[in-house]
Structures are given as structure tokens and as C-alpha cells.
Amino acid sequence: MPVPRSRHDHYPRDDAARCRRIREAVAKLDAHWCSADTAPGGLFAAIDAVADQPPDRVIARLLPWLADTGWLTARLGEALALLAADPFARPPLRPVGGGDGGSGGLILAERGAVRIALHIHPAAAAAPTHAVFVPGRAAIRVLAAAGASLCLHQVTVSAAEEAGGFTASAAAPCHSAPPRALADGEILHLDTARQSYSLTGAQGDVLLLELTVQPPTPLPIRSYDLASRRLAQVSASQRDASFRTMALTLLRHLGRPDAAPLFAEATQAGDFALRWHAMRELIALAPAAALPRLTAMATADPHPEVRRAAQATLALYPKPSPSGEGSETCQLAG
């Protein structure tokens, strides 16, 4: 059965020749960029040369790519030329963020733990209410300050927490510095496990070129409420764990009980935030299937807060009656 087309859908899918030209033009530009990036002196080659270095060293070695943005100007010019030739072409630049009118951007390069991205903070974006701390290092060049004020946020993280001993109950509060003017051309250096920032008062769109290094770590991503300065949420920091988190949520929304083994497997992952997220989603999807893993988690999970959460959730399960009724299904508020 054909899918009805939106009146806003003007993509020329019925023009086979034009669609072929679009695909060929995009593929040609992608191949050109890949060739330039992997050649000696190219961006990928520069990243690969420091792949085994500590994050601070990686940042230092790649800073020239922030200082001289001629390569970025050329790349955006080629992307615009592709769009000028056909507005339905999609330049080979992966978008990130931008939902609900918030900040978004384009990923310019990503190799292992290293990412270089162009970020836009719209002038009309809502005032930030949370500060997010993502383990790693970052260097951020301000391409257009647009009159914005910068507020830096800081939180203390101990060596034990970085090594895998983080608990929400012992998390330090967040502290914010007084706002200051953001300046065109300045470069911010952040230990993003402990430092974050927010922007306010911009008179136009703020444009940032951001270099981040986020190697695998047991320390989770932490979101703090700026009003109370208290920890509001934790989530998996490792990218594969983050992708699995999103995939499990999607499977639960799709109502796929046949995928329960994937959820059960994730409840034994190394990342405690992923383990508990998978458990919650499995309970919402298939409570009976979740019960054996929840029982094991309540007694043997290596993280104390996951054990306590599992024990509290286990107490919500109805006790089976002597006849066995009520032992197979139950309703739990998610």
C-alpha cells in the first residue's frame, strides 16, 4: 500500500535521473573529503597520529585545526556549492542536536574518541536549566560570540569516582561562576568531567568550533539542576552504551517482547547506568521476563545503588498466591 505523501514533500523521487545525479554528487564530495582527510597532513591523519595519547596531549596536538579554520571555510563552501547545484542534495556532514530549537550542529570529523564539530547556539534558545558533565577534555574556539555571556559550571570528582566508584548519593554539588562576556576568537579549555558551561543573552546565533576527546570511562554523564545545584540525572558515558540505551528504549516503545534477551544481556553490561536502564525498560516491556534478572540484580549487582533500586522495585512485584495466580504478570508504574 503506497504511503500518502505530505504536501510539504517536494523531493523529486519520481525523477530518477535527478536523484541519481544527487547521489553521485554527494558521493563524489564525500570521497573528496575522505581522500583529503586521510592524506598526509589531513584531518583524519592528524587524529590517527595521536590516537594513543592522553586526552590533554590529543587536544594540544590538534589545536592548530581550531586556530586556522581555512579548511573549515573551504569545506563549508563546497557543501554550499553542492546545495546550490541542487537544493535537495544533502552534504555528507552528520547533524547533531538541534531539537526543540536548542543548540545543534554538524560533525566535521569523528575518529574513535575524538570529535570535531561545529555548534550553533540559536539566539532564541531557551535559557539553560541544567549543566551536563561529560567525561573527557574539550577545546572550544568561539567563531561568533554574538554578545553572549558565558557561565562556567564546576563539580568536584574524586579519583575513586573516576575509577568506577561513583554514586548519586555521594555526588558533589555543582557550583557556577559569575557570567562573563564571551569573546570572538577565544579558546576555552575544559576538563568536561568537572567543567561545563552555558550561554545566555546572545544577540544572535553563537557559533563554536569544538574539539572533544572522550575516551572510555566508568564515570557516567551527569546532569545537574542549576537552580538547586543538585545532581538530577546520570546516564551512560561510553558511546556504545549510550547507543544501546537508545536502542532498548526504542524496542520498548515498539512493544517488542521478542527482544527481551537483548534487554537481559544489557542488564549485565559493565556500565551501571546501562544496566539499570535496561532493567527498567525490560520491566516495562515484559515484567514476568524481567523478574529473574531483577532478583539477581537485587542481590549481586556490583553497584550499591543499582542493588538498592532493584530491591525496591522487586518489592513492588505482587506476591504469588498459594494457588499460583498473579505470579506471571504484574503492572508496574514506570
PLM region descriptions:
Residues 244-254, 276-285, 308-318:
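Structural detector for internal amphipathic alpha-helices that build alpha-solenoid repeat scaffolds
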Residues 2, 10-114, 226:
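A short, N-terminal "cap"/entry segment at the start of jelly-roll beta-barrel domains
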Residues 235-236, 251, 266-270, 298-302:
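Alpha-solenoid helical repeat architecture
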Residues 225-232, 256-267, 288-299, 320-331:
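Amphipathic alpha-helical scaffolding segments comprising HEAT/armadillo-like alpha-solenoid repeats
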Residues 114-135, 181-183, 190-193:
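Conserved short histidine dyad/triad with adjacent acidic residue
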